[in-house]
């Protein structure tokens, strides 16, 4: 049946009979019994592909192909006797006989259709995976095998190769089957394609007429089943040579046009319907899948989505106008530089930063973990107007919360890490803070409760995007374990024992009390006044433009003795979190202190590993190179 004339039954529609009785909705009366596991994998498909690209070696080529199930729901038969639940009256002209339609297949509008159908396609995917594991060349010829060939890169491969392991991953998203392969021969690609198509036909039987086959011949004729190093998968264009991805060109151009029209409407004092705003922002959010930090620009949009006004006016909402303008700029720039998939995957940190802020100042330390950097400590005293404006019991009228200060401190930590650890492209960073709201805001790259924090999140989003850094691991550190940064943040006179009149005094204290391995020295890096002014301006809610945050002055200047770049210091820092004495006793026994230190190391390793694991997709059986989360000890 032609799509233009195909009817879709709305099973979420309540029906009122002539006698006034209302029939219960089919969806409301449905007892949900379909397997849910298939839907769990549904939302992981794109992430699985991104992670696979990120794990591949630089010198490999990734080939991609995809297959579409034609009229998928209509190929799933109802259990005998259950089809009457979908029956409906065919619309007729007045006076015509009543005609009942009794569908025998799954209906598009039924709440259980997606999980039942996805269970079938996931089963086909698992069968295909088993076929892939058979010896290359052992599967019977498939009638659609000819559609695999033709791409330039395919023709450049040798026909067969006895050396080289076959790496492949299979994904399915509703009715779209996708395979990514690192082959050493044409034979390997043909084997994987045959395995997938055979697996599909084991669940959705083949048709003698190719045009009616479950595997869409129309899509195959368009080249979708042809293995190539360039392919559009789930709305994104992937490059198997450079391991990059970017929003499909047509979708990106349409988004840019819409956002531009919104900004023009603002200049004309016009509004746009809320429905359009909601729909387009959802597409922008999806586009930001391929743009590091992009979500951090959407806080003003999130606030409006919660209010749901009938009309959205940009000229009345400066933060919203700025957010849309920033989003359009980042999307436009992505046209000339696709995102490397490695920029989108978290992992064990190359560098670690720990920060603390008080009403007096901010202090932090920066150390190398998997990569080397100068072990660095920094501090910055807040100006008097900031200290005086901090909200507290003694100052309930203050407009800056402690959490705002902590997030501002974390932004300063990040800017200092850009200076100390550069370059940060494709590096993995862990940031520790003892403030729970700060950790939550950075994890979500969004804030609902503070306009100051909202602007600070925007700053981080812009800087993450510029640096092309991997997803940030943000973790909470207990306050009583954060003395290494408590000290510099309170070193301006509020704590007499930690009052350092100069950066040289701070350096001496750290080298004496936090002695580095191998007689190395700490480096004290002083934030420049220009970079400090930018951070403080956000606390003052002074407007800054996109360029103000994209083109930064030098962030810091080293003071006094400079240490040597080193790595693997994070576990060493944990030795300064175990107390050396308890009230009521002279000291810990050495064995007890060592035991507590070992427990703390294990717990903190687990904390980072769990945080990284949460940013990874659900596990799935595949033959693809994978980097373990925990580094080899």
Say what each PLM segment does.
Residues 97-120, 152-153, 370-408, 429, ...:
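A short, polar/acidic, helix/strand-boundary loop motif
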Residues 1-128, 246, 253-301, 305:
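Catalytic-core region of right-hand nucleic acid polymerases
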Residues 238-280, 487-631:
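Flexible, low-complexity interdomain linkers flanking nucleic-acid-processing modules
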Residues 43-56, 122-126, 400-426, 457-468:
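Metal-dependent nuclease catalytic cores in nucleic-acid-processing enzymes
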Residues 414-483, 490:
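RNase H catalytic domain
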Residues 34-45, 66, 135-161, 169-171, ...:
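Polymerase palm active-site segment centered on the conserved acidic dipeptide of motif C
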Residues 83-91, 116, 237, 352-382:
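Acidic, metal-ligating active-site segments
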Residues 304-341:
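Amphipathic alpha-helical
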């Amino acid at each position: 049946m032609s799509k233009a004339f195909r009817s879709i039954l709305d099973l979420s529609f309540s029906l009122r009979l002539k006698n006034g009785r209302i029939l219960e909705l089919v969806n409301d009366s449905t007892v949900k019994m379909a397997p849910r596991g298939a839907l769990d994998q549904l939302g992981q498909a794109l992430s699985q592909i991104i992670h696979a690209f990120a794990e591949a070696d630089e010198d490999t080529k990734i080939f991609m192909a995809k297959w579409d199930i034609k009229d998928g729901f209509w190929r799933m038969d109802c259990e005998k006797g259950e089809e009457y639940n979908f029956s409906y009256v065919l619309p007729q002209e007045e006076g015509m006989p009543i005609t009942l339609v009794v569908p025998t297949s799954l209906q598009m509008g039924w709440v259980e259709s997606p999980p039942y159908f996805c269970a079938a396609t996931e089963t086909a995917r698992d069968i295909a995976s088993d076929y892939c594991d058979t010896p290359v060349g052992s599967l019977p010829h498939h009638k659609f095998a000819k559609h695999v060939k033709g791409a330039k890169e395919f023709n450049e491969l040798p026909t067969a190769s006895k050396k080289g392991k076959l790496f492949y991953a299979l994904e399915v998203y509703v009715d779209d089957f996708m395979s990514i392969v690192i082959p050493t021969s044409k034979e390997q690609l043909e084997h994987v394609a045959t395995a997938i198509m055979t697996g599909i036909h084991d669940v959705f039987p083949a048709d003698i007429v190719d045009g009616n086959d479950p595997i869409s011949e129309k899509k195959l004729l368009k080249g979708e089943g042809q293995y190539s190093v360039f392919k559009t998968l789930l709305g994104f264009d992937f490059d198997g040579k450079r391991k990059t991805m970017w929003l499909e060109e047509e979708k990106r151009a349409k988004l840019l046009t819409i956002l531009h029209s919104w900004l023009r409407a603002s200049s004309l004092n016009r509004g746009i319907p809320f429905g359009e705003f909601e729909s387009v922002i959802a597409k922008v959010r999806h586009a930001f899948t391929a743009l590091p930090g992009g979500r951090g620009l959407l806080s003003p949009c999130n606030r409006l989505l919660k209010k749901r006004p009938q009309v959205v006016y940009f000229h009345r909402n400066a933060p919203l106008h700025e957010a849309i303008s920033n989003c359009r700029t980042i999307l436009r720039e992505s046209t000339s530089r696709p995102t490397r998939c490695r920029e989108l995957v978290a992992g064990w940190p190359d560098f670690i930063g720990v920060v603390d802020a008080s009403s007096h100042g901010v202090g932090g330390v920066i150390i190398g973990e998997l990569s080397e950097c100068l072990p660095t400590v920094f501090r910055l005293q807040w100006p008097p107007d900031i200290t005086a404006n901090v909200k507290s019991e003694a100052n309930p009228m203050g407009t800056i919360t402690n959490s705002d200060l902590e997030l501002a401190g974390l932004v300063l930590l990040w800017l200092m890490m850009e200076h100390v650890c550069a370059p940060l492209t494709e590096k993995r960073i862990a940031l520790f803070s003892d403030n729970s709201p700060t950790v939550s805001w950075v994890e979500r790259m969004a804030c609902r409760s503070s306009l100051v924090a909202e602007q600070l999140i925007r700053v981080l989003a812009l800087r993450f995007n510029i640096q092309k850094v991997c997803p940030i691991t943000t973790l909470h550190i207990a306050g009583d374990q954060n003395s290494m940064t408590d000290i510099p943040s309170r070193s301006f006179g509020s704590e007499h024992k930690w009052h350092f009149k100069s950066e040289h005094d701070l350096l001496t204290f750290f080298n004496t009390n936090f002695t580095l391995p191998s007689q190395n020295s700490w480096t004290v890096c002083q934030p420049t006044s220009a970079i400090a002014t930018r951070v403080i301006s956000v606390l003052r809610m002074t407007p800054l433009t996109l360029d103000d945050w994209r083109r930064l002055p030098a962030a810091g200047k080293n003071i006094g003795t400079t240490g040597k770049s080193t790595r693997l210091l994070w576990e060493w820092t944990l030795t300064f979190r175990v107390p050396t004495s308890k009230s009521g006793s002279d000291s810990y026994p050495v064995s007890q202190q060592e035991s507590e230190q070992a427990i703390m190391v294990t717990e903190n390793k687990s904390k980072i590993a769990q945080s990284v694991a949460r940013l990874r997709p659900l596990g799935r059986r595949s033959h693809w190179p994978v980097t373990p989360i925990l580094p080899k000890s």
